[in-house]
């Protein structure tokens, strides 16, 4: 399912589904006829739980190959969502599937898992693993929500969860548990909402594109335009885009030396200089990419500037139990530059200086807009009140608290977003 970006509908998370002989009215699933397959479970990642369940039951094509080969009907049991990005969500999925291979989980779950491989694949063992994961860093520091879709599995989970809670000193501070079903609007991703979101992303990207052009023109940086000569510089109007302000209404911070507005000729692409390889040596690796994209200031996802509507309905966003290791997540690292470098107009939460194109950290809470310089956040974490004690010799922070939403987490969890 989906989790991190709840407000945008385009969410991400995990599901635990299993083959059942029960029929639930909201899913219209027929009882399975193969009794040998009862209790079979599957763990995966998806951005659309409803579509993913239909793929498991062979109602639509695409994905879920291992679970559609005459393996009966499937029901969705639980969904975990609220991850800061897809990389964190996919790491959660891999650790849930391979707890004894995960460096974070192997010691925590070794005493709860049975010795045989077949018993480790049963639903009870997977629930024990999930309970241990929710007490393990970094997932214990993330604002996750565990939604149970089936009452009988929720009752079994309650007994397992109470056993784990008795062995711990405190509950996970940010965990939320609730019950629901797939008819919840949170889990619905219809075509109309997806199309509206895509149009808005394209309009915001065009606005941001024009904003950067105007700012660079006032700063008299002709080299900036050299790398943009291959892009369509025309931004859509309000009537064409249907969302977002017109680029002409974007305010540009004044620059020193000249207060005149940029002339139309200043926005024209400058002639390029090529070396013996046919490449402009003044361009960095991002500017040399013909598919270079600009990111929206209000969106964590990048959208192409010269595309009005991007059809992402064909992107399933699902996996079927890949065998990547705990650190081998290169195919899934889709974190954009916004997670590492600040955008125009963003300021540090401590020194209140601009973080535009500077290395910064972001809040792990997906709904918080906190940004801070790495050094400023580290100093605030070491000395929360801004005053150093003569006996304070610690140089590396242990925990950090967001000054906006009060979200607390280990320093390693904060710095992981910068070092991905």
From Swiss-Prot:
Signal peptide: none
Compositionally biased tracts (Low complexity): 247-266
GO-annotated molecular function: 5'-flap endonuclease activity; crossover junction DNA endonuclease activity; zinc ion binding
Main location: nucleus
InterPro entries found in the cross-reference section: GIY-YIG_endonuc (IPR000305), GIY-YIG_endonuc_sf (IPR035901), Slx1 (IPR027520), SLX1_C (IPR048749), SLX1_endonuclease (IPR050381), Znf_RING/FYVE/PHD (IPR013083)
Start and end residues of each stretch annotated as Disordered: 237-306, 311-330
Superkingdom: Eukaryota
Biased composition (Acidic residues): 311-327
Residue ranges, compositional bias (Basic and acidic residues): 279-301
GO cellular component terms, semicolon-separated: Slx1-Slx4 complex
Disulphide linkage map: none
EC number(s) from the headed UniProt entry: 3.1.-.-
Segments forming domain GIY-YIG: 19-106
CDD domains, per the entry: GIY-YIG_SLX1 (cd10455)
Subcellular location: Nucleus
Reported cofactor(s): a divalent metal cation
Alphabetical GO biological process terms: double-strand break repair via homologous recombination
Zinc finger (SLX1-type): 348-405
Keywords: DNA damage, DNA recombination, DNA repair, Endonuclease, Hydrolase, Metal-binding, Nuclease, Nucleus, Zinc, Zinc-finger
Enzyme class: hydrolase
UniProt subunit comment: Forms a heterodimer with a member of the SLX4 family.
Main function: Catalytic subunit of a heterodimeric structure-specific endonuclease that resolves DNA secondary structures generated during DNA repair and recombination. Has endonuclease activity towards branched DNA substrates, introducing single-strand cuts in duplex DNA close to junctions with ss-DNA.
Family statement drawn from the similarity comment of this UniProt entry: Belongs to the SLX1 family.
Name this protein carries in UniProt: Structure-specific endonuclease subunit SLX1 homolog
Biological source species: Monosiga brevicollis (Choanoflagellate)
Organism placement in taxonomy: Eukaryota, Choanoflagellata, Craspedida, Salpingoecidae, Monosiga
């Amino acid at each position: 399912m989906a989790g991190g970006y709840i407000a945008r509908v385009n969410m991400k998370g995990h599901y635990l589904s299993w083959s059942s002989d029960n029929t639930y009215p909201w899913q219209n699933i027929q009882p399975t006829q193969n009794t040998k397959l009862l209790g079979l479970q599957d763990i995966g990642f998806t951005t659309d739980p409803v579509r993913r369940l239909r793929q498991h039951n062979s109602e639509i094509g695409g994905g879920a190959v291992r679970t559609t080969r005459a393996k009966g009907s499937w029901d969705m049991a639980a969904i975990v969502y609220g991850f800061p990005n897809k990389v964190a969500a996919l790491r959660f999925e891999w650790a849930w599937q391979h707890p004894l291979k995960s460096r974070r989980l192997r010691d925590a779950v070794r005493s709860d898992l049975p010795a045989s491989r077949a018993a480790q694949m049963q639903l009870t063992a997977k629930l024990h693993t999930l309970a241990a994961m929710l007490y393990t860093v970094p997932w214990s520091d993330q604002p996750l929500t565990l939604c149970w879709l089936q009452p009988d599995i929720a009752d079994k989970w309650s007994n397992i969860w109470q056993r784990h809670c008795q062995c711990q000193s405190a509950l996970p501070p940010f965990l939320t548990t609730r019950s629901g079903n797939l008819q919840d609007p949170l889990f619905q991703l219809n075509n109309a909402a997806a199309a509206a979101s895509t149009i808005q992303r394209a309009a915001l990207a065009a606005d941001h594109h024009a904003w950067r052009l105007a700012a660079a023109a006032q700063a008299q940086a002709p080299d900036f335009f050299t790398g943009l000569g291959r892009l369509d510089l025309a931004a859509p109007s309000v009537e064409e885009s249907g969302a977002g302000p017109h680029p002409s209404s974007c305010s540009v911070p004044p620059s020193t030396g000249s207060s005149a507005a940029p002339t139309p000729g200043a926005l024209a692409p400058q002639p390029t200089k090529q070396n013996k390889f046919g490449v402009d040596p003044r361009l960095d690796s991002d500017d040399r990419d013909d598919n270079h994209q600009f990111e929206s200031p209000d969106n964590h996802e990048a959208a192409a500037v010269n595309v009005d509507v991007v059809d992402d309905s064909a992107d399933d966003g699902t996996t079927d139990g890949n065998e990547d290791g705990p650190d081998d997540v290169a195919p899934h690292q889709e974190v954009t530059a916004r997670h590492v470098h600040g955008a125009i107009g963003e300021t540090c939460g401590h020194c209140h200086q601009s973080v535009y194109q500077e290395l910064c950290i972001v809040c792990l809470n997906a709904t918080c807009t906190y940004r801070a310089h790495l050094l400023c956040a580290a100093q605030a974490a070491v000395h929360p009140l801004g005053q150093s004690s003569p006996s304070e010799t610690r140089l590396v922070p242990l925990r950090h608290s967001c000054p906006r939403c009060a979200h607390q987490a280990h320093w390693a969890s904060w710095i992981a977003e910068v070092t991905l």
